[in-house]
Design a protein with these regions (language model features):
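Single conserved hydrophobic/aromatic residue that forms the stacking wall/gate
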Residues: 1-15
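Terminal alpha-helical segments
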Residues: 18-122
Length: 122
């Protein structure tokens, strides 16, 4: 788990960290993780095109880690909202959510494309 590896495995500790961040910091953290996830997924696709499926697998694993980090932060926001501690939405946060959604979709589609490449190589 992304947070556990950083000493933030405890839900209360994560909430404490989230409360100490500004909306801009939260949004940029989501954008950064989502962007890295997307880039890693496309690196996986590039490797798969060359038949380097083990490298592709490693890139996809790294991509999933970054997606999970962004998604966990988003989940914390949703939980805080449900607890009555919501944040005021702004364009930057909408942008962050767009990045997260498109990076997850890109990774999922790339996983399917890699499966097709493997079938074609058989």
């Amino acid at each position: 788990d992304y947070y556990a590896s950083r000493g933030l495995g405890d839900v209360y500790k994560r909430q404490e960290v989230m409360m100490s961040l500004t909306i801009e910091e939260i949004a940029m953290t989501i954008v950064g993780n989502a962007g890295e996830a997307r880039s890693l997924a496309f690196e996986a696709l590039k490797e798969a095109k060359e038949g380097n499926y083990e490298k592709a697998k490693k890139y996809l694993e790294q991509s999933k880690e970054r997606s999970l980090a962004a998604h966990e932060m988003q989940t914390e926001l949703i939980c805080n909202e449900a607890d009555g501690n919501g944040i005021e939405m702004n364009l930057l946060m909408v942008h962050a959510q767009d990045h997260l959604m498109t990076s997850i979709l890109a990774r999922e589609l790339i996983e399917e494309m890699i499966t097709l490449y493997k079938k074609l190589d058989k």
